[in-house]
Amino acid sequence: MAAIPLQREIHYPESDGKPMAESDVHQAVMFDLIHALKTRYSGEPDVYVSGNILLYYVEGNPRASVSPDVLVTWGIPKGRRKTYLLWKEGRSPGFVVEVTSDTTRNEDLRKKKDLYEQLGVEEYFLFDPLDDYLRPRLQGHRLLDGRYEPIPPSIDGSLVSRTTGLRLKPEGENLRLIDEATGERLLFVDEIDQELARLRKELGRS
């Protein structure tokens, strides 16, 4: 009887060796977006928010990966993951943001856009915080019959995300998230710190 070869376990690396962000500005935008979205969905156990995590989309092929800067997936549990294995999660992200730059323009505008379309990512946004090349510097795409169509901008350059119910609006080097239903602005991390400091100061006076 012929020996049955042992199936080798395939390793899916947690890092692709690339820097997390092009600059401190790009990193800050990513961090603020992820933090704001995690806060928004903190009470919903089946909404996963992350960023800069390697997403593997072909089982058995560790080269088939992409690392979204910011992602939200509905219908999978919260929890820390080392990697995002699409065949195990069973769902693609529904919302992705790439904080783009002149260095990553070809990948963000072509390769990632085509891939996210194929993977069924419902909404894909690009934001160029340093105004390197993208005109306008916030752009969005939404799936329609399996193909991406541009999301029309408002007069102020903002875009509405149907998946999150948020308006995305450039503010200087930042990308503000605003609840479309209530008009509430999701705070950046430093704004939360400032508000806490203000409250502590007021409590100290009382």
Where are these predicted regions, by residue range?
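A short acidic/basic microdomain associated with nuclease active sites
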Residues: 43-55
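A structural signal for short, well-ordered beta-strand segments and their strand-loop junctions
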Residues: 48-50, 125-128
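Short acidic/polar active-site loop segments enriched in Thr and Asp
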Residues: 122
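C-terminal interaction segment
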Residues: 1-22, 36-39, 55-68, 75-95, ...
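Generic preference for hydrophobic
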Residues: 49, 70-72
